[in-house]
Amino acid sequence: MLFGNKAKKTSIKKQVLITRQTADGIITYSKTCHPNEGILILRGKSSKNEIVVDGLILPPFSVHGPYYSGFPSYDLPFDLSYVGTAHSHPGGSNKPSLEDLNNYYGLVSIIINYPYTYNTIAAFDRDGNHMELQIITALDDK
């Protein structure tokens, strides 16, 4: 049948695991950039059910302001370990803005808002849906 029953699209919810050292790096960098936004590239590995984030990269030629942060992705060296980005929101919310979604890079977007603590870190997929985030002490803990 051409126009009848469409197959239902099932998506697997991925869990994001981030090492405590990496989360501490995001917190410290966000506090350093405050009152401007800061942006970092996340390194790690992805499997069917989870994304493990275990490192950070400072993107070359990144720009920062009170309401924006970004980087030219064409200046990045090719690296298959990039799994997404982390950036800070100096005020209000850690929810992704429309601009955040339009400039999405990778598999996960981690957003942290002021006052930059473990409790203000959140992870989102490409559509802005909340992803479960777990901070682990080391990769052996997962």
Where do the language-model regions lie?
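Conserved beta-strand-loop surface patch within small alpha/beta domains used
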Residues: 1-82, 90-142
